[in-house]
Amino acid sequence: MRHFLDFEKPVAELEAKIEELRRMTDPGELNIAEEVTLLSDKAERQLRTLYGRLSPWQKTQVARHPERPKARDVIAGLITEFTPLAGDRGFGEDAAIVAGPGRFKGEPVMVIAIEKGWDLESRLKHNFGSPRPEGYRKARRLIEMAGRFGLPVLSFVDTSGAYPGVDAEARGQAEAIARGIDACLAAPVPFIATIIGEGGSGGAIAIAAADTVLMFEHAIYSVISPEGCAAILWEDRANAAQAAEAMKITAQDLKRLGIIDRIVPEPLGGAHRDPQAAITALGAAIAETLPGLAALAPEALRAKRREKFLAIGQTLPV
């Protein structure tokens, strides 16, 4: 059964009526096929209208949709011969970061991804997509490995933020994130990052300081969650919608501000309605971007990458 968001109620009612008609075994005088077609067209128009004017808070809900494709789906759809590697060679393993070598369209790459999980058991295993220090150190280790072996890096980001627990802080969470960003900037190979759902704070940028940052049409990318921002500025998480509007967290705003480089279109109604179509569109965007980066020398890649991130915000009005 499809999960509908609050603002999708008109579409939910239409689709429920369509399903009811399709289940009818004795249509009587009703022309079921014609009625279903009319209602389907109406539902599509309603969906197009709704998704053509989503607010930042509504986009946040879409980015968090439980049926939205996760990192495992993207990897399964785009990467062959994927071999996940474990451990930071210092403390332990963190399943929130799923990473290892594989092939993209037949060519070897290094994949770094943050996995939220898709049911209760997997969400607990992957810590709801909030990496600990050992996860970021594993990512750094594999980015450095990619540099040694000349493998382009593809990262897929979906996290509300790094794990903020006391144990993570005790093991150097801030240092792990900072060194992760440094490893991204220093990588002598092409690096493409994609925000596939949520991109939350330093926990996201630790694997997203890339040559090219792609972002799904209804994903979000911000320094803090809207609820967290509202709790700080208004001391009330109920102001999350207002915070989302103020923070400019949508792909459209971030493209305009120069934070991301390209928006990957989603199927009508969001990636959760047709995950395979969304993943195919992402694969096409990566395939179009990678050759241009692969043509650059390592020093040119590093220089352009650093220049890109140092330039962010310099031309914005204060």
UniProtKB/Swiss-Prot annotation:
The keyword Transferase applies. It is found in: Cytoplasm. The keyword Isomerase does not apply. SUPFAM superfamilies: ClpP/crotonase (SSF52096). Signal peptide: none annotated. PROSITE patterns: COA_CT_CTER. It catalyses: N(6)-carboxybiotinyl-L-lysyl-[protein] + acetyl-CoA = N(6)-biotinyl-L-lysyl-[protein] + malonyl-CoA. It is an enzyme of class 2 (transferase). InterPro entries: Acetyl_CoA_COase_a_su, ClpP/crotonase-like_dom_sf, COA_CT_C. One of its GO terms (molecular function) is ATP binding. Its main location: cytoplasm. Keywords: ATP-binding, Cytoplasm, Fatty acid biosynthesis, Fatty acid metabolism, Lipid biosynthesis, Lipid metabolism, Nucleotide-binding, Transferase. Pathway: Lipid metabolism; malonyl-CoA biosynthesis; malonyl-CoA from acetyl-CoA: step 1/1. GO terms for cellular component: acetyl-CoA carboxylase complex. Its EC number is 2.1.3.15. Residues 39-292 form the CoA carboxyltransferase C-terminal domain. It holds the Pfam family ACCA. GO terms for biological process: fatty acid biosynthetic process; malonyl-CoA biosynthetic process. Acetyl-CoA carboxylase is a heterohexamer composed of biotin carboxyl carrier protein (AccB), biotin carboxylase (AccC) and two subunits each of ACCase subunit alpha (AccA) and ACCase subunit beta (AccD). Component of the acetyl coenzyme A carboxylase (ACC) complex. First, biotin carboxylase catalyzes the carboxylation of biotin on its carrier protein (BCCP) and then the CO(2) group is transferred by the carboxyltransferase to acetyl-CoA to form malonyl-CoA. NCBIfam families: accA (TIGR00513), AccA_sub (NF041504), PRK05724.1 (NF004344). PANTHER family: ACETYL-COENZYME A CARBOXYLASE CARBOXYL TRANSFERASE SUBUNIT ALPHA, ACETYL-COENZYME A CARBOXYLASE CARBOXYL TRANSFERASE SUBUNIT ALPHA, CHLOROPLASTIC. Belongs to the AccA family. This is Acetyl-coenzyme A carboxylase carboxyl transferase subunit alpha. The gene is accA.
